[in-house]
Amino acid sequence: MPRSLLTFATILLAGALAAQATHFTATLTGAQEVPPSGSTTLGQMSMILDTGNSTLAYRVVVGKFATAPTAAHFHRAAAGVNGPVVIAITGGPSIYSGITRALTAAELADLRAGLWYVNVHTSQFPGGEIRGQISAATLPVTYGAGCMGSNAKIPAISGRDFPSPSNAVFQVGLTNAKESSIAVLLMGVSKTQYGALVLPFDLSIIGMPTCKALCDDIGIGGSTATDANGAAFMPVLIPFQPALVGITLYSQWYVVDPVANLLGLTNSNGLEAKIQ
C-alpha cells in the first residue's frame, strides 16, 4: 500500500476508535489553564463510560495545593480555550470520585471528540489552578503466545481497564491455567530485552518446549493461586506519581504445572499496558 494511503487509513482508524471510546484519561497541569496559572501541582484523571446508561465513573487524584481547592468540574471546550461547566464533580481535596448523571448524545459526542476538559479551582486561582484535556485512553493489548498446559489449554492474560496514577490498582487477569495451582506474574518495562536476553526468548532450552519469555521483570508483580477453573487475578499498585505517565508495562504469567513439561511450568501470552 502506498505510504499516503497507509497514513490516511491510519487516521481513519484512529478516528473511528475515538468515536467509540469508553475509557478516558487526562493529566492536569497549571500550564493547560487559560491563561496558564504557573502552578506546579499535578493531577491525573481516569474515567469509564457505562454504555448502558451513559454515565461516567470518574476518579481524579491531585497533589497538594498552596491554598484549599474550592471546586472541580468537567467543562466543554477544545484545548487552549475556556468553556462552560458541563458537570460538577465531587470529592476533594486530594481525590475526586463519583458517577455522573446520564450524558446527552451531544455531550457524549463532544467528549469523544476531545472537547471536554477537567479542572480544579482553588482560592488562589478561582478560575482554575490545574486543567487537563480529556482524551480516549489506550487500552491494554496482548501480544505473543503462551504454551499449552496439562489441561490442553493455553494460559491467557488480560488487563482490566488501564494502569493510571489516579487508580489504586491495575488488575491483571489469568484464565485457562492449571486449576488450583500457583501462578506468578512477571511485570517489567521491556518486551525486547531481559538483562542479557533478547526477547522473545525460547524457553525450550530449559525444558519448556514451545514456551517463550515475553517480558522482563522489575519486581512489581507477585504470586497467587488459581481457582478451580484455572483463573486468577493480580492487583498491581500504581502509585500517584505523574512522572510514571507514558511508561508502558509488559506482563506475563507463569503457572506451576508439574506434568506439562520437563521444567513443570507453562506461561501465558504477554500484556502491554500504557500508564496514562
Feature locations, PLM:
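Generic hydrophobic/packing signal
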Residues: 9, 122, 148-152
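Hydrophobic alpha-helical segments
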Residues: 16-17, 266
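Metal-centered catalytic cores of metalloenzymes
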Residues: 18-72, 76-139, 255, 275-276
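N-terminal hydrophobic alpha-helix used for membrane targeting or insertion
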Residues: 9, 57, 108, 155-156
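N-proximal, solvent-exposed segments at the start of the mature chain
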Residues: 48-52, 135-276
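Bacterial N-terminal signal peptides
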Residues: 7-16
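A residue-level signal for beta-strand positions that form part of recognition/binding surfaces
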Residues: 10, 25, 55, 182, ...
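Positively charged n-region of N-terminal signal peptides that target proteins for export
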Residues: 1-4
